[in-house]
Amino acid sequence: MDLQSIINELKRHGATKIVFKPLANNDNTKQQIYFGASFEALQLLPSGEVYSAGISKKGPIFKAPLNFYWLSPDGEIENAPGAQLILYPKYPEIRFSGFLKKCKSSPSQLMQAPTQQEREARQNKHRILFFGLAADRVIGYVTHWDEDVSLTVNAMVEANEYPAIATVFYDLDDNAVDTKSDLLNKLKNIYEMGLVPSQRIKNGEIIPYVAQNGAGFTLESLFGISPNGVAEPDFKDWELKAHSGSVVTLMTPEPNLGLYTHNLEEFLRNYGWSNKPDRMDFASIHKNNLLNKRTQLLLVMEGYDPDKQEITDPDGGLLLVDESGNVAAGWTYSKILEHWKKKHSRTCFVSYSKQDNNGIFFQFGPSIRLAEGAGIKNYLHSLFVQAVYYDPGINMKYVAGRWKPKKRNQFRIKWKDIESLYETVVDISLNDIC
């Protein structure tokens, strides 16, 4: 198949985004396929739930199944049920394995470990592994070293004609497109609109939004984005966040360990408080290795080496423990990774002001912050040094003869500390954009 045929077939089978990776000699079924010295591929690819897979010679291991299909040269697809991502936090790196198992139409002849003679002959040649990304699956296609597609795409990569994505991939859809410039130009237009009424998109139409927290919905509506809870970038490869305060909420994962998961009422009676007979609360900031005087709980990171900034025990996690060592609530590292992968590597924080005068209005800009490279290593380190903290808002109210729960488990960071989460942070004024 030529390049356009590959694109057409991947899209015919549901791909909405196409990326590719030039394969090195070491990218084979024996040594697995290298997906980068970070966990960004986990954010890019729609994988299954992350789980602990024990400890190997390479240290702790996490795995995530990948609903992966091979596209054959005749345009048919077949599932490779053993396909998975393997995460090595010690390095860190991700590898792709199991992609040939129980799949008759897999390109096994192209994915074998090379002999020394083959390795030397192919030293400056690359197969191209294409990934068509759909909502719930990945469709793969690989080319031969000497195919015209391989030669053409490799030449374009060397000429920097494809934007890099998730460290080792290239974005086929955005050939020669500068998404950052597009984003800033769009925001400049929105800034020049001045005050915009609070609104959101519902069923494809813009409707008024009267609640006080409408800045994010309004910004999304101006980009034509409908709130749907799908973990995809808001504008090309950027996540948009309207920002005006001193604190940023990073993620809201429910605990998967401890008393909280078994009996919320008992959790609140043991560690919360009650100012009214019909209400119990648990709402107090907890920071790593700092005893919370109100709840008498200590937040600890079990199985984490702060000096090496790496996970040492895949079955460890972030735990709230009482003075007897009981786990009140906790999050395994698998749970944290699973939630983190839904975040985006590139985030644009958009400042805004609000007016409440015969209706709520917002103006976005002029201050913009572009943050790139949101690595899990930075996130865990920020937790350890208390920059990221747990800020819950949990209660139960006694209504109609029963206790009714309201859960909000937030991990937050102060705006002044946000740079610790990213590799690069740049502040821009839209007034400077021509």
Describe the predicted segments one by one.
Residues 237:
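Short hydrophobic-acidic sequence motifs that mark active-site Asp/Glu residues
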